[in-house]
Regions:
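Extreme N-terminal starter segment of soluble prokaryotic enzymes
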Residues: 1-4
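Glycine-rich phosphate-binding P-loop
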Residues: 6-19
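Fold-independent oxyanion-binding glycine-rich loops
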Residues: 8-10, 38-39, 107-109
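N-terminal phosphate/diphosphate-binding loop that engages ATP/GTP or pyrophosphate donors
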Residues: 17-84
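Switch II (G3) loop of P-loop NTPases
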Residues: 102-112
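Conserved small/polar residues in nucleotide/adenosyl-binding loops
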Residues: 114-116
Length: 116
């Protein structure tokens, strides 16, 4: 099984809903699947929902390695918080999930071409 990404053209268009359904369906079919929300801004509700759909033993930091408190796009949130989104942190978390699961469903941020 291959890993894949769920993306959308905006926020609040159903990416989390679809990602959770895919993870849950794969697990019900006997496939060791997990969700992954590389970057979240504002809150971690999407990551919590992905954890409910997938393996319960994963921490929010494993499912969502970059969390920015400002509820805006990642680039602006990082600037407001005087930080940068470290792609290496995201890749390490993704690699760890990929090594431990047959399938990782990656939920993208609000816009398909958003700058992080």
């Amino acid at each position: 099984m291959r890993n894949f990404i769920v993306t959308g053209t905006d926020t609040e268009v159903g990416k989390t809903y679809v990602s959770c359904l895919i993870v849950k369906s794969l697990r019900e079919a006997g496939i060791n699947a997990a969700g992954f929300k590389p970057v979240a801004c504002g809150d971690r509700q999407d990551a919590r929902l992905l954890r409910e759909a997938g393996p319960k033993d994963l921490t929010l930091d494993e499912l969502n390695p970059v969390f920015l408190r400002n509820a805006t796009c990642p680039y602006v949130a990082a600037r407001l918080e005087n930080t940068k989104v470290d792609e290496k942190v995201i890749l390490r978390a993704y690699d760890a999930l990929s090594a431990a699961h047959e399938c990782v469903v990656v939920e993208g941020v609000g816009l398909s071409l958003i700058h992080i």
